[in-house]
Amino acid sequence: QAIGCKYTFPNEKIKFTGTLGHIGTTSFYPSKNLGCYGDGGAIFTNDNDLAHRIRMIVNHGEKIKYHHEIVGCNSRLDSIQAEILNVKLKYLDEYNSTRKIMANNYNLAFEDVGEIQIPTVISSSEHVYHQYTLRVLNGKRDQLKTYLNDLGIPSMIYYPIPIHKQKPYSNNQILENTDILSDEVISLPIHTELENSNQDYIIDNFIKYFK
């Protein structure tokens, strides 16, 4: 979700997200900053042996056609999706810049609104705003979501059920901060086709809720 984002180390070395360790992943789901028109994704690695193994896994475990060395699956990106991404990749920086401008519009408009916490970015990093997510305090999040929906303003909660409460991972862990965030976060519309007039409508009505 942070493709195109950069991190600056204390020695001023700059690296992109997905390249900070030996392996990184990204999704090309259509709503992502760099999305195809179907399902897709990519794995980044600086380890040639690992890259070789990954290529086999995503191609039925094949090293040579019809010779299966390991258990694999069919996770190849089809040529149509690849071509769409090849074109859109040229515009990734532009897409991310547009999202940053929209996020800044929200931040400036909401900086004096009580009972919310807008996203913050540390000086050594940046945000490409796949989502514009803020916190709504004092138990007002769900009522705000209903209010926005009644005005035709979409909003989303990422995510209403945290991982530690999902059945496959539930082991009665108590993660207090995770639960608090899950009850408070809400994401407002942000994408490259959002017109200024529509964002103004969202901002005006969002602020009205807290007056």
List PLM regions with ranges.
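Glycine-rich phosphate-binding loop of ATP-grasp-fold ATP-dependent ligases
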Residues: 33, 37-42
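PLP-dependent aminotransferase class I/II
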Residues: 2, 6-12, 46-211
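Hydrophobic transmembrane-helix microenvironments that flank and shape a buried ionizable site
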Residues: 19, 36, 75-76
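Acidic, glycine-centered active-site loop in nucleotide-sugar glycosyltransferases
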Residues: 20, 39, 132
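Short acidic donor-binding loop at the edge of a beta-strand
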Residues: 23, 40, 53
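Active-site pre-lysine segment of PLP-dependent enzymes
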Residues: 1-31
